[in-house]
Amino acid sequence: MRNRITILTLLILAVMILFSGCTDNSTAQKSELATVNSIEEIDAMLESAPVFIEMGAGRCPACVLQKPIVEELAAKYDDKVHFVYIDVDKQNQLAAKFNVYYIPDIFVIARSDSGTYKYVLDGDLTTNSEQAKMIGLTQKGPLEITILDALRLR
């Protein structure tokens, strides 16, 4: 009898552990990043808010790892910042416009002054897009700091 109680207790415990990690995906916050086809679309977005741009490709392992980090930030700041994903394989002209050679490549444009983009770099603005790039897998902390800087500098 004691063995049956022990086995039953272990079985119930195993089932509880098995299902403890399951969650309902409908409660998870996910934010789809916008896609753009032209510089003009980016310019239109800049009229109302900073633009966070991630350049990547589905074939890139680091880009796949970057995606949930950016989606989490997009869910948090979507009402204050435009989040854009540009697939370099599909939009190679935009990748060339921003001199993208390595992916993922992330940068934030705070504003445009007389047609010149002002990128966020270390808490300040720069017109040098190369210096403002975050190339490779970038953790949430530096990305969030850059977003907050863009909002402050806007």
Model regions and ranges:
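A short beta-strand-turn-helix
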Residues: 30-50
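Structural micro-motif
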Residues: 98-112
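Non-catalytic, surface beta->alpha helical segment in thiol-disulfide oxidoreductase systems
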Residues: 108-154
